[in-house]
Amino acid sequence: MEAQLSDVEAGRRFYGELFGWTFGQTGESGDSGEDGEDGESDEGGGDAGDPASGPERPKAPGKAEQPGTAERPGRAGRPGVPQQPVTSLRAYLEGEPVAALVRKTDGRMPTVWSVYFHTPDARALAERIRAGGGQVVTPPHPVGELGTAALAADPEGAVFALWEPGGHRGFGRRHEPGTFAWAELYTRDTEAANAFYGDLFHDALFGPDADPDFGRAPVSDVFPAEMPPHFLVHFLVRDVEAALGTVARLGGRVRVPPFETSYGRAAVVSDGQGASFALLQR
């Protein structure tokens, strides 16, 4: 998953303090002594599936993923070298990749957290999305040697992305404080959502080894009824009330105060630039 932001450096400060993330380029550990920007680490990026990170946990199609869209940030503090704006950063927790922050190339684009779903074949899944009444907004395309990405929307317009891994497998850590915990689809038609996503990700949702980390609920359960259908990324925290205090101190906003769900106690917030996400306590 990744956040599209106008100011990646501001995002670094916000999420770094909120979740304890460090940041760096693709292939860095994120714990190299200068927030991952300037260290010449030989440890690699800690990507799941890399030899340095131990055995990879197999992921079924439909698992939410962290994409591999990070480039080398401009190095700071070198006399005579013009400073380049940071266009993207990969976020790490204890040296393992957990998310990415990407600068928006067009100010008209939404400031948002995007959910990526793992798939072994992005092109085949894109065709099934079209056949199921969805839309492929951005066709599958290579992201260097990291993998293949695509952007899609379901029949109601909720946007999500696809990630076919190459050199970058996805999350190195999840389901622990400071990392991805859940993605909830807020929809106006739960039956239609069940049919669409149930067909796309049947094995991940209903197969013998299914361990889904996303679900769906009516928009009106949490938001005003006129809110468009959308996915909401949840990050795990130890204490949701304490985390809300940190969000406010860092310039973010509480959009929906804590409420109980079937998967934990959640609150919806936004960062200082308006990207919404949820804090989840279990």
Predicted regions and their residues:
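Vicinal oxygen chelate
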Residues: M1-D7, R75-P79, S88-R90, P97, R103-R128, G132-L185, G207-P218, V222-F223, ...
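N-terminal beta-strand motif that seeds the catalytic metal site of vicinal oxygen chelate
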Residues: M1-R12, V112-V115, W163-A195, L200-F206, ...
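Core segments of cupin and vicinal oxygen chelate
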Residues: E2-E96, A131, P139-G147, L185-G215, ...
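Active-site-adjacent scaffolding segments
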Residues: G30, R78-R173
